Amino acid sequence: MLGLRLPVCRRAVMASPRACWRLWHSSTAAAAGMQDLSAVLQRNLALRNQSLYNQSSDTIRCSMFDSDGALIGGAAADIRREELIQKHGLLPRDLRKIEMARRHDLVPIVLVRDRCIMVSLLTIRALVKSDTVLLFDPMGIGMDSVAHTRFVADLQTRLKNQGAPGLGKDPLPYEFRALESIFITALANLTAELRVHLAVTKGALHDLEYGIDKDKLKFLLVQNKKLSVFHKKSLLMREMMDDLMDQDDVLSEMYLSEKMRGKPRDVADHSELEMVLETYYTQVNEIVQSIEGAIANVRTTEEIINIILDSNRNELMLLGLRFAIGLLSLGSVMFVAALYGMNLENFIEEGNVGFALVTATGLVLMVCLFRYSIKRLHKLQKMTLLGGQGRHS
């Protein structure tokens, strides 16, 4: 742009300096405006890609399954937001979880409404009814990943409820079979992620047993942060299930099929659902305990590494102090030698033992000073755990 402005500016200088200033100022303002506009467009595009909610079309992309587990329409479809709220008896704030950032939210949630159940577990967003299941696309794109394909296949199999050879059909109602498939997939993903974290952490700790360097410590720090994030995610899921099982009225409201038949459950009559939730709660609790054990191992290793590094640092400091003590002792000998070497008259030069006397005096002074300093240093080393100094024999 400067190459285009300079000729114009030269022509403007021939007219007047003020005209050149106005031309340069307007060009700079226009360039700054274009940069601001580009930043705004990029931010809006990122927000649009990160959300399920399309501001222009007011639609949400989802896949619908009927009572037999068949995919309605054969593929995912876009549903209007208002239609989704009115048709399923939702509140506008209920869609907040599926309209957030494209990266899955850490906070799991199960919302029970009069005619449906909203579920948000890890990467799964679903709306479960007594005869319909809606799976929301959290990425805003086609749901063609391997994990999602397996989840859809398992969900369809459970919704069909045809029963395996030699086994009867699942006695659980439609909505509970859908919830069971969601919990199984979420826990399977959580378990797979746990195995990866445990394997990586075990390898990092094993490498530190043979040597400690900067790269290994940096990698352990990064892995410790990942473990903390995973621990928070699994802990929130356990707390969500714990809170859900403590609410008897919510558990009884989750029997959607019986409510549709006009026979709602009593507040205390939810033993089937509670047994299902307790099964998955036990698995989540095991995951939480496993990741807490891994975090404890990392912290123990960090403490041991800090102790080793502190010990090495103390050894280096002691080595430096010993060198300083040796130099101090040698300096005392040099001081005596300097006094003897002065070109002044003294009584020592009159005898034949002057040199030997000065040498012996310097050596004795050096040894005494060195032993005294080393003794004091060793006394400082023998510190008790209570903060006092140990006895030195």
Curated annotation (Swiss-Prot):
GO terms for biological process: mitochondrial magnesium ion transmembrane transport. Coiled coil: none annotated. GO terms for molecular function: magnesium ion transmembrane transporter activity. A motif (YGMN) lies at residues 340-343. Its main location: mitochondrion. The keyword Metal-binding does not apply. Residues 1-45 form a transit peptide. Keywords: Ion transport, Magnesium, Membrane, Mitochondrion, Mitochondrion inner membrane, Transit peptide, Transmembrane, Transmembrane helix, Transport. GO terms for cellular component: mitochondrial inner membrane. The keyword Transport applies. It is found in: Mitochondrion inner membrane. It is a multi-pass membrane protein. The chain crosses the membrane at residues 323-343, 350-370. Pfam families: MRS2-like. Belongs to the CorA metal ion transporter (MIT) (TC 1.A.35) family. Mitochondrial inner membrane magnesium transporter required for mitochondrial magnesium homeostasis. Modulates the conductance of the MRS2 channel. Involved in the splicing of mRNA group II introns in mitochondria by affecting mitochondrial magnesium concentrations, which are critical for group II intron splicing. Forms homooligomers. Interacts with MRS2. This is Mitochondrial inner membrane magnesium transporter LPE10.
